[in-house]
Swiss-Prot record:
One of its GO terms (cellular component) is cytoplasm. One of its GO terms (biological process) is response to stress. Its cofactor is Zn(2+). Residues 6-148 form the SprT-like domain. Binds 1 zinc ion. GO terms for molecular function: zinc ion binding. Keywords: Cytoplasm, Metal-binding, Zinc. Belongs to the SprT family. It comes from the Bacteria. Zn(2+) binds at H67, H71. InterPro entries: SprT-like_domain, SprT_Zn_ribbon, Uncharacterised_SprT-like. This is Protein SprT-like. It holds the Pfam family SprT-like.
Amino acid sequence: MDEQQLQQLTEQLSLTYFKKPFRHRAYFNSRLKTTGGRYLLNSHNIELNKKYLTEHGQKELEGIIKHELCHYHLHLEGKGYKHRDKDFRTLLKEVGAPRFCTPLEKEKKPQRKVRTYKCEACGQTFLRKRKMDTSRYVCGKCGGKIKEIIKKG
């Protein structure tokens, strides 16, 4: 789906569910990471996350568009457009728009190596994510020398 098709879909959904025209822009914003879409109060445009279309399909995207159109139409009418407002929650139910969107699959970060250090005097162990210069630090418990324990295999 390209930007023009998205614009047409948004205009069509606005007329079908709200019986009002959508006179601004709807477009994909690749910078959106954790949200399905957002309604911009100043420009009245709607930004959408394209990942929802690729991961969850057009039905999910239509739900997000309807949700953002609720914000859009209520804001232009001067009614309560925020999530906590009664006008907003009522309109969501009327048009069948979701209150929240389905979460995206999280991109898993590579797991960091955990380094283990041990005090030579008292045996206190320290787990660290970052490498530590053992010549600059001493054990906080007894003041003894610290040595890195290297696990084999």
